Regions:
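C-terminal lobe and adjacent flexible extensions of AdoMet/dcAdoMet transferase-like proteins
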Residues: 249-300
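Short aromatic-enriched loop/helix-cap "lid" or pocket-rim segments at secondary-structure transitions
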Residues: 129-130, 194-199, 266-271
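Short catalytic micro-motifs in class I SAM-dependent methyltransferases
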Residues: 158-162
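Conserved N-terminal segment of class I S-adenosyl-L-methionine
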Residues: 2-143, 153-157, 287-292
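Short N-terminal helix/helix-N-cap motif within the alpha/beta-hydrolase-1
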Residues: 102, 163-168, 194
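Conserved class I S-adenosyl-L-methionine
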Residues: 182-215
Length: 300
């Protein structure tokens, strides 16, 4: 925490990125030399690796955990608004995409913001957010039911890797945010990163989506009595796909903040089974960038 206060975020980001690339150098060389012949591993290796990697801690869905999580993320939003936007006092109407419980918007509401939160499902909506005036709506983010230029600020946490068509969602966000307004996104893990399948309660093996065919993962989870894997919950977009998306809309959106956050803790699997990766992507950074943080300013 002390380091975060002393060293600016962009400096920390550059240092971490440099360290990550140095650490990944050997794995990258092995990956680049690997043949592109499609390769998958078998049941016995999956069984062995599954025993090696423990299950992660459960995400807290109790009221106190949801409140703490919402408060923390709302503070991030307010810090971004204060530090990175030109018209801080004019940012009053805020839209959250993929809100789930709406608790982030609740804490923004308590700071005097007019908040609207949408999600494709309504079962997660928290009554506390409703009670305090957050407008919670069940709605598809790819088909927003709002007038053009309705909001000063749009944000989304941990949802863009789930949206079936991120481009449609981004286009809709551009449409409903005011000219001069902002779109702030933080999301991950990206599909090609170690935890990209989001099968946390089923398959603990990092990069399992590269190492094993989907049918084997599904059968393994069933045979072991693990939670069924919902392959449709992720859109399978890579870092490369998102970078191309940003470029397609660069005439409408100016990047104010942009960070690619790396995770290089499972490079041993890339070094040991390089063809499993090379046959599915040719861009090494797809494998080691875990998440993206970006703040756009709508310029057109």
């Amino acid at each position: 925490m002390i380091i975060k206060k002393i060293i600016p975020k962009f400096v920390r980001y550059k240092l971490v990125t440099t360290f990550s690339m140095l650490k990944a150098k050997k794995a990258k060389k092995i990956f680049e030399r690997a043949p592109e012949t499609p390769v998958f591993l078998g049941w016995d290796i999956l069984d062995s690796l599954q025993q090696k990697y423990p299950f992660p801690p459960e995400y807290g869905y109790d009221q106190q955990s949801l409140e703490q999580h919402g408060k923390l993320l709302a503070r991030e939003i307010l810090n971004i608004i204060q530090a990175k936007t030109e018209k801080t006092k004019n940012i009053n109407t805020i839209l959250e995409l993929g809100c789930w419980d709406g608790m982030v918007s609740l804490f923004l509401r308590r700071q005097g913001k007019k908040t609207t939160s949408i999600d494709i499902r309504s079962e997660g909506f928290d009554e506390r957010a409703k009670h305090e005036g957050v407008k919670l709506l069940q709605m598809d983010a790819a088909h927003l039911q709002f007038e053009d230029e309705s909001f000063d600020f749009i944000f989304s946490f941990g949802a863009f890797e789930h949206f079936a068509d991120p481009e449609l969602v981004l286009k809709e966000a551009i449409r409903v945010v005011k000219k001069g307004g902002y779109i702030y996104l933080i999301f991950g893990p990206l599909y090609m990163s170690p935890s990209g399948l989001h099968a946390y309660r089923s398959i603990t093996v990092p990069y399992c989506q590269f190492l094993f065919p989907k049918e084997l993962l599904r059968d393994f989870a069933k045979a072991k009595g693990l939670m069924p894997i919902n392959f449709a919950q992720v859109n399978e977009w890579s870092l490369e796909d998102f970078c191309k998306l940003w470029n397609r809309y660069s005439h409408r959106l100016k990047k104010i903040i942009y960070y690619e956050n790396h995770k290089v803790s499972h490079l041993d699997l890339i070094r040991k089974y390089p063809s499993c990766f090379k046959s599915k992507t040719k861009y090494f950074n797809n494998l080691i960038v875990q998440s993206i943080e970006v703040l756009f300013n709508k310029i057109n």
